[in-house]
Amino acid sequence: MSTALKADTPLYLGIDGGGSKCRAVIVSADQQILGEGLSGPANPLRGMKVATDSILTATQQALSSAGLAFNDMSRLIAGAGLAGVNMPQYYRLFSAWQHPFKTLHLTSDLHIACMGAHQGLDGAVIIVGTGSCGLAEVNGQLIEVGGHGFPYGDNGSGAWFGMQLLHKVLLSLDQLAPPTQMTTLLLQELAASNSIEVVSHFMQATPTTYAKYAPLVFIAAEAGDATALQLVRQGAEFISAIADRLLSIAPPRLSFIGGLAHKLLPYLPEHIQQQVTPALQPPELGAVWFARQRSQLPSSVMSL
């Protein structure tokens, strides 16, 4: 057995729990990545059981990938950055969860994204995935923007683009708005032929469902569709406003992460594009940084 896998060696678990996916990584005390896992949404707004099941599934995959047993879950010093726990009621729910880990240190997905992007140093990060939000920290000054959840916020996010796509397609099908290539793309994707079939598909839609169809907006925009281009530019304006707010405190680095980040970047103003630098590490490794920091504090300390 390697030193990293000995029973008395600390093991760290990093969890990045977003609105669509949950990523887990197990890291040894000497910072070797031992195993990784991937599962479904871990946002408690979707329900505690959904979120905790996703965390446990991703963790079990990471254990298996690392050659560890299920019982080794109790050895893990876990750091979890979850979408939704910026809301006090969900933070309390997760804090009371009877988890199977050695310890669980809880924070937001935005916090671990920033820690990973800048390896724990000052900087700013914007998430453009299922949701949208941003955070900057400079010399102890903290700015957090967004993170209010869909449909109340998350402008410029995957869920927002998917919802706007649906609105525009339905208007076009009713001949209340100009034709758009997005109609053809969505009908093909859903194997639908009319507005009733489209609406039926979305009747129980979650933010993840809407976000799934966001790429269709960009496909149409890249083909020159005027309606899609208008939507992309509107979404880019929302994200640009977040960036300008964060840049107001002059963070030394700005990184974008999330499934739509690379699609939106070309539509952002030049002064923002020039500030963007690649994230140094992914959010799940930011969660490991967080766990390592917090495990040096009293075990009762858990903080956003």
Predicted regions, residues:
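Active-site nucleophile and cofactor-binding loops and adjacent substrate-binding regions
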Residues: 103-112, 127-128, 276-285
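ATP-binding/phosphotransfer module of carbohydrate and carboxylate kinases, centering on a glycine-rich
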Residues: 1-71, 116-122, 166-304
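Glycine/charged-rich beta-loop-alpha catalytic/anionic-binding loops adjacent to active sites
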Residues: 37, 98, 102, 142-149, ...
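Short, conserved acidic/polar surface loops in the N-terminal third of protein domains
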Residues: 89-93, 115-119, 136-139, 267
